[in-house]
UniProtKB/Swiss-Prot annotation:
This is Protein EARLY FLOWERING 4. Residues 94-111 have a biased composition (Gly residues). Homodimer. Interacts with ELF3. Changing R44K: In elf4-205; reduced homodimer stability associated with a slightly impaired circadian gene regulation. It holds the Pfam family Elf4. The gene is ELF4. Keywords: Biological rhythms, Flowering, Nucleus, Phosphoprotein, Phytochrome signaling pathway. Changing A59V: In elf4-212; reduced homodimer stability associated with a strongly impaired circadian rhythm (short-period phenotype). Coiled coil: none annotated.
Amino acid sequence: MKRNGETKRRRNVAEEAEQGEDPAMWENLDRNFRQVQSVLDRNRSLIQQVNDNHQSRMADNMSKNVALIQELNGNISKVVNMYSDLNTSFSSGFHGGKNGHDGGGAAGTRA
């Protein structure tokens, strides 16, 4: 199913390029959304581990939750920053016009 979505995105990038849009901007946004999704997927895994540890009621597992929750909190901060960077990149791409976008941007600097 992901492959079909990738194909559609690539086709949309090609169509936008034909219409004079900035395909580099869309590719950059797509790449950064995938980075955000990766962190969100990791958070889902962390939450499941925390739940499993909590349900086990074993002292060792409960103590592991401290580090897992700290990582989860750090990841939430990363996601907030990544979305902020995406917003800036997206706004710059549209307000600056296609000539004002350099294809890079701060959104690609965090992971």
